[in-house]
From Swiss-Prot:
PROSITE patterns found in the cross-reference section: PH_DOMAIN, RHOGAP
Coiled-coil stretches: 594-691
Residue ranges of the region described as Disordered: 360-433, 438-457, 480-511, 555-596
Entry keywords, A to Z: Angiogenesis, Coiled coil, Cytoplasm, Developmental protein, Differentiation, GTPase activation, Nucleus, Phosphoprotein, Transcription, Transcription regulation
Record-level Gene Ontology MF annotations: GTPase activator activity
A GO biological process held by the record: signal transduction
Annotated gene: Arhgap22
Site residues by UniProt (Arginine finger): 201
Name this polypeptide is given: Rho GTPase-activating protein 22
Sequence ranges of Polar residues compositional bias: 407-421, 438-456, 491-504, 581-594
SMART domains per the UniProt record, alphabetical: PH (SM00233), RhoGAP (SM00324)
Subcellular locations according to the entry: Cytoplasm; Nucleus
Cited CDD domains: RhoGAP_ARHGAP22_24_25 (cd04390)
Source organism, top-level taxon: Eukaryota
């Protein structure tokens, strides 16, 4: 039986429908080398609804797209497990399409293959896959996510990349504290933008920020010149910090840092110690970047009188980018906003105390450690005149204005004088438990029984940090003298500084504590002490006053080695009683001259501290006064503007009253005219009626 025309049409329609369905639904050929679903699946990077254009009928169909690994899957529904098709993104490129002026509501982008070998990997359309997002923001998110996947094998895509991976990738350019993008943005802002009003608060141009982001993600290094907008570069820096997969302070440390913020609100000194401990425990890359950013933000707030960006404003802007919870629900964000802002304020304001200035050449050294070298003490060296008293080699990782608290048991214990020479173990690592800027001295800590070796407490190391370690190298092992009871007053005489960035005084005026100390050293040790005093003088008396030491030394049995080595300038050397004259008799700490020198030094320390406090108070008062004046000026402007608006409203009210009176008068006139017309009409009709009646009466007799 021959097929009829209708059967032929049905067969052709069935074949056409089957072929069209296979093309539209994205089915791949079932050849042995082309499986339907790839075997290797990566993590889900992004998922959402998109519209894809069908290949034959060119209409749009909505599908659930999932970006997993380097493949883009699409499903008919969100709950389906079997994809209708997938697109391999390796070797492809994604492009944003300009909206059609006739139909501006479409947000289109397309994925095109990079070469002839990649074209067969796009199942729905061998040329390009056209997709449409629901909004401009959604389209930009999809394009950025797909580009990161495309550029990831090439070592690119710095935005959204883990900080450790970025640092590891840029290690070939040399040791750095921050990624190249951050350094480039910071250098440009430091050069051209510190005086820009509203820095980091005013947004940059969105399209320029996106172009710069794409350039950095592509591996390019765009240069900033005089035509580059400062706010655009600032927005790019904030965008990089915001798009880190894990913030600078990791998610696991979020609760610990919030606890530090709560402690800061109760006890600022203890909170600073705990915060420094938490900062030192950060990973190396995070630690370096946080230190770099806080130092830069401190430079920005130093120009707050011009750029109007105080520490609080910078903390508000950068706090959520530096420290944020892993699950950003509204309740958690509202509860931690004030704490995060306060914590960021402390990090910026006290960055010099919280971050130890470690060297880039020694990244393996942990934060907060002091390395004590070998130290040998022999009786033969004591007995020889002119011998180098105590050779001590100490290297320290404490550099900069970082504070340290040394344990009482950290110095090596030496044997008695009758025993053999005691040698301390060489190259020991002592971990400092805390970094502290304001040290609170307890009175009971000064007490120590007799016969116990010397203990040393170093609450603060000032900006010239190495003078302390060098100065301590001249100390000998000794016992506490009988005057240790009088040293109790030194702890109670301590008082905290009014501000955290002003080092607390150790009250050198407690002459009883100083008077109970006597020592005699050899000539070489004397030079070390003098050098330490010189460094102490260079680092300002306020920094020297922050050092509190407790010791009691027995008179040294050294014979007279040289004479006439006493410093000629007693008025400019704080450690002059330490140096001595080189004779076998120890200096008398109770002499009037030395007591006068000590009192003068104590008064100088107090005066320097009070001057620093007054200077800071004056700065704070000027700043608050300036802010009050600015607020008053704004209020005056607002009041004048309100008065002008009130005058305008009064004029409008007067005009409305005039119009109302005019309308009432017009209404009254209209009513009078209406009444007049009514009477005239009545008279007219009455006259007309009488005339009509008279005419009828005259006709009737006829």
């Amino acid at each position: 039986m021959l097929p009829t025309a209708s059967s032929k049409r049905r067969t052709f329609a069935a074949r056409y429908f089957t072929r069209s369905k296979s093309l539209v639904m994205g089915e791949q050929s079932r050849s042995p080398g082309r499986p339907l679903v790839p075997h290797k699946l990566g993590p889900v990077l992004k998922a959402g609804w998109l519209r894809k254009q069908r290949s034959i009928m060119k209409n749009w169909q909505q599908r659930w797209f999932v970006l997993r690994g380097d493949q883009l899957f699409y499903y008919k529904d969100k709950d389906e497990s079997k994809p209708q098709g997938f697109i391999s993104l390796q070797g492809t490129q994604v492009t944003e399409l300009l909206p059609d002026p006739e139909d501006p509501g479409k947000h289109l982008f397309e994925i095109t293959p990079g070469g002839a070998t990649e074209r067969e990997k796009v199942p729905a359309n061998p040329e390009a896959l056209l997709l449409m997002a629901s909004s401009q923001r959604d389209m930009e998110d999809w394009v950025q996510a797909i580009r990161r996947v495309i550029w990831a094998p090439l070592g690119r895509g710095i935005f959204g990349q883990r900080l450790e991976d970025t640092v590891h990738h840029e290690r070939k350019f040399g040791p750095r504290l921050a990624p190249l993008l951050v350094e480039q943005c910071v250098d440009f802002i430091r050069e051209r933008g510190l005086s820009e009003e509203g820095l980091f608060r005013m947004p940059g141009q969105a399209n320029l920020v996106r172009d710069l982001q794409d350039s950095f993600d592509c591996g390019e290094k765009p240069l900033f010149d005089s035509t580059t907008d400062v706010h655009t570069v600032a927005s790019l820096l904030k965008l990089y910090l915001r798009e880190l997969p894990e913030p600078v302070i990791p998610f696991a440390r979020y609760e610990d840092f919030l606890s530090c913020a709560q402690l800061l609100t109760k006890d600022e000194g203890e909170g600073t110690v705990e915060l420094a401990k938490q900062v030192s425990n950060l990973p190396q890359a995070n630690y370096n970047l946080l230190r770099y950013i806080c130092k830069f933000l401190d430079e920005v707030q130093a120009h707050s009188d011009v750029n109007k960006m105080s520490v609080q404003n910078l903390a508000t802007v950068f706090g959520p980018n530096i420290l944020r919870p892993q699950i950003e629900d509204p309740v958690t964000i509202m509860e931690g906003t004030s704490l995060v802002q306060h914590l960021m304020t402390v990090l910026i304001r006290k960055h010099g105390q919280l971050f130890a200035a470690t060297s880039l050449e020694e990244p393996a050294s942990p934060h907060g450690t002091v390395e004590w070298g070998s130290e040998e003490v022999t009786r033969d060296h004591r007995g020889e005149p002119g011998s180098p008293g105590l050779p001590t080699h100490r290297t320290s990782s404490l550099d900069g204005p970082a504070a340290a608290v040394l344990s009482r048991t950290s110095p090596p214990r030496l044997g008695s004088q009758t025993g053999p020479a005691a040698t301390s173990p060489g190259k020991k690592m002592h971990t400092l438990p805390v970094w502290k800027s304001s040290f609170r001295q307890q009175g009971s800590r000064s007490e120590s029984p007799k016969g116990v070796n010397s203990s040393l407490e170093v609450p603060i190391i000032s900006s010239g940090g190495n003078w302390l370690i060098n100065g301590l190298s001249s100390l000998r092992s000794h016992r506490r003298a009988s005057s240790g009871d009088r040293l109790k007053d030194t702890g109670s005489a301590q008082r905290l500084s009014t501000y955290d960035n002003v080092p607390p005084s150790s009250q050198f005026s407690s002459t009883a504590s100083v008077a109970s100390t006597s020592w005699s050293v050899a000539s070489s040790s004397r030079e070390a002490s003098v050098s330490s005093c010189t460094a102490c003088r260079a680092s300002n008396s306020s920094a020297c006053s922050s050092l509190h030491t407790e010791w009691a030394l027995e008179p040294s049995p050294l014979p007279s080695s040289s004479e006439g080595h006493q410093s000629p300038d007693l008025g400019h050397s704080l450690d002059e009683p330490c140096v001595g004259s080189g004779s076998s008799e120890p200096n008398d700490p109770g002499s009037p001259t030395q007591a006068h020198v000590r009192r003068c030094r104590a008064l100088q320390g107090q005066v320097a501290e009070l001057r620093a406090e007054l200077c800071q108070q004056r700065t704070e008062y000027k700043r608050s006064l300036k802010s009050i004046e600015e607020g008053s000026a704004d209020l005056r402007k607002q009041m004048s503007r309100l008065e002008e608006e009130l005058d305008q409203e009064r004029k409008k009210y007067a005009m409305l009253e005039i119009k109302l009176r005019n309308s009432e008068r017009a209404r009254e006139d209209a009513e009078r005219r209406n009444q007049l017309l009514q009477r005239e009409m009545e008279e007219f009709f009455s006259t007309l009626g009488s005339l009509t009646t008279g005419t009828k009466g005259s006709r009737a007799p006829e």
